[in-house]
Amino acid sequence: MAFHAIRAGEGDAYISAGVEAASGFARGHSDASPGQNLANPRFADAMARTARLAAEGGAWTDPRESGALPDAYIAMGQTAENVQQMLGMSRREQDEFAVRSQNLTEKAKDAGFWSLDITPVVLPDGTVVDADDSPRAGTTLEGVSQLQPVFRESGTVTAGNSCPMSDGAAALVVMSDARAKELGITPLARIVSTAVTGLSPEIMGMGPVSAIPAALRAAGLTMSDIDLFEINEAFAVQALGSAQALGIDMDRLNVNGGAIALGHPFGMTG
């Protein structure tokens, strides 16, 4: 929003911030279908279809191909299981990617990389919070592989290969080149282009497959021009699946870990 406001000439410097307190949600509240009185009745068939898939399993197909509405109220974990069905990705592949995320995050933390992003917070009792508490040091494939599926009895998505519920806050200053030069500020990064694309909400995690090429086209760049890619790890299946679909080598993807370890505070991620 800050970038587009600057581009539209509405201002030249903004503080862009977000905050999330997912720990305040009732258990399951953030991943539950709305009550009958809240759900648009037009989506009743779509919600019933998701419920059948969750209970019985089966291959996912895009309902739009038959003229049906997609499930706009679908739980995020069910979208991950749909992606798994669509791609045929094994449980082991997902678990290996999740362990990679945890291990790379631990390595980057030990090297002091993540401390560059953290402003210490002093609590009223004097406690200093200066590190993320979500990453699990020493995560192994053996440990992750023992976890049970969460969303479907015969599924592959577990607490180990998904992002955790997290609290978090972030803020940064976004300004125009002209304003930065006027103030003598050297930018840490530049926004070259952005893109928004759409797909069925029932496989929401595959959005990078269309959005990344669109952003590159807008910038006059190609995949080979990019040294490092960051794809949010809501679930291992969608992050790894998107990378595979785009032909992104693992040595260019989330090289310091990702949301499976760090967390995915919805209101601040990004």
Language-model features, listed with the residues they occupy:
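Beta-strand segments within the central parallel beta-sheet cores of soluble alpha/beta enzyme folds
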Residues: 14-19, 95-100, 118-123, 185-196, ...
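Phosphate/pyrophosphate-binding loops at sites that engage ATP/ADP/AMP, CoA/4′-phosphopantetheine
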Residues: 83-88, 180-184, 213-228, 246-249
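Short, well-ordered amphipathic alpha-helical segments that serve as non-catalytic structural scaffolds
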Residues: 1, 76-83, 99-104, 175-179, ...
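N-terminal extracellular/periplasmic Venus flytrap/periplasmic-binding protein-like
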Residues: 56, 92-182, 245-252, 261
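Active-site-proximal alpha-helical scaffold in enzymes
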Residues: 1-20, 28, 84-113, 171-178, ...
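Flexible glycine-/small-residue-enriched beta->alpha junction loops
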Residues: 13-82
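Active-site pocket-shaping loop/turn-to-helix segments
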Residues: 23, 30-31, 67-75, 85, ...
